[in-house]
A protein has these predicted regions:
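Acidic beta-strand-to-loop metal/phosphate-binding motif
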Residues: 20, 73-77
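Local sequence-structure signature of Cys/Sec-based thiol-disulfide redox active-site neighborhoods
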Residues: 9-46
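Intrinsic disorder/low-complexity signal
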Residues: 109-111
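Eukaryotic intrinsically disordered and solvent-exposed regulatory patches
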Residues: 5-6
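Non-catalytic, surface beta->alpha helical segment in thiol-disulfide oxidoreductase systems
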Residues: 76-107
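Thiol-based oxidoreductase modules, predominantly thioredoxin-like and allied folds used
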Residues: 44-60
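Thiol/disulfide oxidoreductase modules built on the thioredoxin-like
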Residues: 64-70
Length: 111
């Protein structure tokens, strides 16, 4: 079986945008995850997500991998952006929308 750290590496490097969250965007299981997912959805790009409650291995190991202790965790372009606060701040300034569109390979100036 693939080592959990290899799985995480594959997820963050194989997807332009990954949100590690408690629950799913449709059914978030914590307020912070809900707000981070809503901010991302508002950017209008598709993103990958991992429900860490259904993946205890990732739940236990991601904080070590990233040196970031809490969830949600937003990864864009293989880099850790941060948690809920940072995601909402970036969304408020319009920076999240730009990052998301660039990562998704869309021209941020369009639409």
């Amino acid at each position: 079986p693939m080592d959990v750290l290899d799985r995480i590496k594959e997820q963050v490097e194989g997807n332009p945008i990954v949100l590690y969250m408690k629950g799913t965007p449709q059914f978030p299981m914590c307020g912070f995850s809900a707000r981070a997912a809503a901010a991302l959805q508002d950017c209008g790009v598709s993103f990958a997500y991992v429900n860490v409650l259904q993946d205890p291995e990732i739940f236990e190991n991601l904080p070590r991998y990233a040196d970031w202790p809490t969830f949600p965790q937003l990864w864009v372009g293989g880099e850790l952006v941060g948690g809920c606060d940072i995601t909402l701040e970036l969304h408020a300034t319009g920076e999240l929308q730009k990052m998301a569109k660039e990562a998704a390979g869309e021209d941020a100036t369009e639409g």
